[in-house]
Swiss-Prot record:
Catalysed reactions, as listed in the record: a ubiquinone + NADH + 5 H(+)(in) = a ubiquinol + NAD(+) + 4 H(+)(out)
Pfam families: Oxidored_q2
Bilayer topology term: Multi-pass membrane protein
Keyword hit for Mitochondrion: yes
Upper classification of the organism: Eukaryota, Metazoa, Chordata, Craniata, Vertebrata
Gene3D superfamilies in alphabetical order: 1.10.287.3510
EC number: 7.1.1.2
Binding partners and assembly: Core subunit of respiratory chain NADH dehydrogenase (Complex I) which is composed of 45 different subunits.
Protein's UniProt name: NADH-ubiquinone oxidoreductase chain 4L
Group of enzyme by EC: translocase
Gene: MT-ND4L
GO terms under cellular component: mitochondrial inner membrane; respiratory chain complex I
Family note: Belongs to the complex I subunit 4L family.
Localisation: Mitochondrion inner membrane
């Protein structure tokens, strides 16, 4: 396994650990999620370039579309929660609270 794949895998694991450690604030969770998406994008792009399979060139674009949608929904949720409660704690996202 080349060292670039190991570095990308370590970046993904580091973002995942950050997601687990800093899960109390929504902004920290969104930043870690974006780090995971970035490492997946680089990994899929390198894999598409190495396989030379024509259909695999659209997978990084599809991942970027999903990452942009996820970021837009996450930021809208962050704005809504911070305007409603005045803080960005993830525990405010519980739908069972009145």
């Amino acid at each position: 396994m080349p060292s670039i794949y190991i570095n990308i895998f370590l970046a993904f694991i580091l973002a995942l650990l950050g997601m687990l450690v800093y899960r109390s604030h929504l902004m920290s969770s969104l930043l870690c999620l974006e780090g995971m998406m970035l490492s997946l994008f680089v990994l899929i792009t390198l894999t598409a370039l190495n396989t030379h399979f024509t259909l695999s060139f659209m997978f990084p674009i599809i991942l970027l579309v999903f990452a942009a949608c996820e970021a837009a929904v996450g930021l809208a949720l962050l704005v809504m929660v911070s305007n409603t409660y005045g803080m960005d704690y993830v525990q405010n996202l519980n739908l069972l609270q009145c």
